Amino acid sequence: MSASKIPLFKMKGLILFLSLVKMSLAVPAFPQQPGAQGMAPPGMASLSLETMRQLGSLQGLNALSQYSRLGFGKALNSLWLHGLLPPHNSFPWIGPREHETQQPSLQPHQPGLKPFLQPTAATGVQVTPQKPGPQPPMHPGQLPLQEGELIAPDEPQVAPSENPPTPEVPIMDFADPQFPTVFQIARSISRGPMAHNKASAFYPGMFYMSYGANQLNAPARIGFMSSEEMPGERGSPMAYGTLFPRFGGFRQTLRRLNQNSPKGGDFTVEVDSPVSVTKGPEKGEGPEGSPLQEANPGKRENPALLSQMAPGAHAGLLAFPNDHIPSMARGPAGQRLLGVTPAAADPLITPELAEVYETYGADVTTPLGDGEATMDITMSPDTQQPLLPGNKVHQPQVHNAWRFQEP
């Protein structure tokens, strides 16, 4: 190996390693408490989509990464989010929002009202047993006032929520130099989202990363990684092939995936024949007696197959972008055998699936008057006709009822 190839090889490995480290750092996932309704089972870091939309407006979790002084979409944003880096005071627009100031707090009014509230609170203890008079209006679900408990006249009335905030979690403010720790954020998340009077936006506090990995292949932007947006079911692990579609080693069928397409493809390929799973058609080994093998190697241009060719089939569904698939049979002049089913034959296949089926062999159609030359191993040996060399497409054979036409 020459000396010029060694640094390039090391650089590729370093880039791959840093990309994997960035992926592991840029996805914050917090485990939920076991037994909570609607949450993942214990030990699985999964958040539902609706929970994360409400958690985006939770105090301390609206730290958007595009406001980071470290740059847009950097891997150290999660360190800043977890409180391992100093808070961001360089941007004036980072501060408590309107819905974050709705919590009942007497801290701004305390210096002026302190000498006035103390005697009233002291006399309130003596007066309250004697007055059964008008009580303050009670909301449903609110406990009655205890002895010595008054409502400040300047305090805004807040509608009670179903889960009132516990006093153990302090109010998180970005103007405060003391940033919340990891345990406070995790405790806030395990407590659940806080209910606000004002309806929040559709995606209130989502931050964006520089790659697209959700199910619909969003235009290279996703927010909190949700298990409902992952390619699998709830709580299933993500594949590296969907996170890094440009790496050909992880998923061969994703090497020409467009990341900015508005619709993502369904990357599941259903093969009906169990033999073709082990023997891939891309290697030219389909099921025994398959129509792909029945084309005579000596006679490439089969008139029976060419008569079934749809005009403009290559410009339709099964288009080959690079036009250099070595597993396809070619004629003497270098042309491929054109036995492709037209795009209108299968209405279930969308144009996004054309990239997925490109590594599989073309669907070679047979004339309607001829049967398929398939080998049925369940039939008795005397019912099978001997296979003769030559063009085996036109030889009548026993039709296998269990073999369906592959997509």
UniProtKB/Swiss-Prot annotation:
Q: Which residues carry this modification: Hydroxyproline?
A: 42
Keywords of the record, alphabetical order, are: Biomineralization, Extracellular matrix, Hydroxylation, Phosphoprotein, Secreted, Signal
From the Swiss-Prot or TrEMBL record, state where the protein is found. Answer: Secreted, Extracellular space, Extracellular matrix
Task: Tell me the tissue specificity.
Answer: Ameloblast-specific.
Modification sites for Phosphoserine: 48
Q: Which GO terms describe its biological process?
A: biomineral tissue development; cell adhesion; extracellular matrix organization; odontogenesis of dentin-containing tooth; regulation of cell population proliferation
Q: From which residue to which does the signal peptide run?
A: 1-26
- What residue spans carry the region label Disordered? 124-143, 259-304
Q: Which GO terms describe its molecular function?
A: extracellular matrix structural constituent conferring compression resistance; growth factor activity; structural constituent of tooth enamel
An example GO CC term for this entry is: extracellular matrix
Report the superkingdom from the record. Eukaryota
Q: Which family does it belong to?
A: Belongs to the ameloblastin family.
Q: What does this protein do?
A: Involved in the mineralization and structural organization of enamel.
Q: What is this protein called?
A: Ameloblastin
